[in-house]
């Protein structure tokens, strides 16, 4: 089940929500374990886990086979994260990859491989060097997504 680690108020310090987020995710994980379900945390923009470091903190603190990563290249780029650094932090937790690319500060996504997501290099690493056997999803968002806009 793809899921997220809670929207954080726009002007708030995400780190101040660490304990609350961990407590809520532990509740989700208990339910997932009971039903033998894997929760896939996506690094969506604006949530607690939208940076590589906070995603790593979640996986380290919650260490559980029922809680894995859905790695979204574009979301990391749009959060001004280096995808290669994020991959290095998270590769052992990744079970699902979203093929979607972006340019920093750019509201629209761009075709895969044309942004700063380093998609070709990181997929080559995943499959050829690390033996990745998880899922891939082509997620070609090329229009403005403003579903959550006021």
Where are these predicted regions, by residue range?
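Active-site acidic/histidine proton-transfer and metal-coordination neighborhood
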Residues: 1-69, 78-80
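Histidine-acidic metal/acid-base catalytic patches
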Residues: 30, 51-71, 76-150
């Amino acid at each position: 089940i793809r899921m997220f680690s809670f929207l954080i108020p726009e002007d708030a310090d995400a780190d101040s929500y660490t304990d609350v987020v961990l407590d809520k995710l532990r509740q989700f994980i208990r339910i997932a374990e009971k039903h033998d379900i894997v929760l896939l945390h996506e690094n969506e923009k604006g949530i607690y886990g939208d940076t590589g470091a906070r995603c790593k903190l979640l996986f380290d603190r919650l260490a559980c086979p029922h809680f894995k990563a859905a790695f979204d290249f574009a979301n990391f780029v749009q959060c001004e994260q280096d995808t290669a650094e994020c991959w290095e932090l998270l590769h052992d937790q990744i079970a699902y990859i979203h093929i979607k690319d972006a340019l920093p500060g750019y509201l629209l996504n761009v075709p895969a491989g044309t942004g700063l997501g380093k998609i070709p290099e990181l997929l080559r690493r995943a499959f050829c060097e690390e033996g990745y056997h998880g899922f891939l999803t082509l997620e070609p968002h090329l229009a403005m997504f403003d579903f959550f806009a006021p």
